[in-house]
Curated annotation (Swiss-Prot):
Disulfide bonds join C211-C217. This is Peroxiredoxin. InterPro entries: AhpC/TSA, Peroxiredoxin, Peroxiredoxin_AhpC-typ, Peroxiredoxin_C, Peroxiredoxin_TDXH, PRX_1cys, Thioredoxin-like_sf, Thioredoxin_domain. Its EC number is 1.11.1.24.
């Protein structure tokens, strides 16, 4: 498992934008590599939408985005199409299909206590290929994208001026807003049986919950 300050491991990966070699593909740029537990899951979908809607802000800081899960590339492509169809949001960044989990294990993205899916990890890598920040979130908690933007800016500022940034530095500069697709609703875990799927669909018809699909339902807290 890698540690903070270490060089990002050299690896060739299959992505939705074709094969690429990391970290060389992004040499001269910063990049944010983030893993998600699985395609066609609700929390991950909200994250991808928010990463996409903030993509230009990352680009303005000479920073690229790249996603990862242990799904196959065909699943990634279909999920990206679903997101475009449902929310009219293009996913402009590549997504790694680490279907054997090799890179995920190198980066400590798979917890032996949390199943075989990747956790919600974030790695910020500088233009020389060094890992500058590592964040891990549990599967049930979505990430705050403005905080990741703030962290990138803080690291770049530290490098440029030889300074350090204090707690809550520039939180006022970034708009901490609810999810653009579910607001402050909470997400109901995806159905794990046909009976549960049918129940969700019935509850949605009654207006008890809202669903974009049978696996993506949300509601207000009572």
């Amino acid at each position: 498992m890698v540690v903070l300050g270490q060089k990002f491991p050299e690896v060739e990966v299959q992505t939705t934008h074709g094969r690429m070699r990391l970290p060389d593909h992004y040499r001269g740029k910063w990049f944010v590599l983030f893993s998600h537990p699985a395609d066609f899951t609700p929390v991950c979908t909200t994250e991808f939408v928010e990463f996409a809607r903030n993509y230009d802000k990352f680009k303005a800081m000479n920073t690229e985005l790249i996603g990862l899960s242990i799904d196959q590339v065909f699943s990634h492509i279909k999920w990206i199409e679903w997101i475009k169809e449902k929310f009219n949001v293009e996913i402009p960044f590549p997504v790694i299909a680490d279907d054997q989990g090799e890179l995920a294990r190198m980066l400590g993205m798979i917890s032996p206590y949390k199943g075989t899916n990747t956790v919600r990890a974030v790695f910020i890598v500088d233009p020389e290929g060094y890992i500058r920040a590592m964040l891990y979130y549990p599967q049930e908690t979505g990430r705050n994208i403005p905080e990741i933007l703030r962290l990138v800016e803080a690291l770049q500022t530290a490098d440029k001026y030889g300074v350090a940034t204090p707690a809550n530095w520039h939180v006022d500069r970034y708009e901490f807003k609810p999810s653009s697709i579910v607001g402050n609703d909470v997400i109901i875990p995806p159905a794990s049986s046909l009976e549960e799927k049918k129940d969700r669909e019935e509850r949605a018809k009654k207006g008890e919950i809202e669903c974009f699909d049978w696996w993506f339902c949300h509601k207000k807290l009572e």
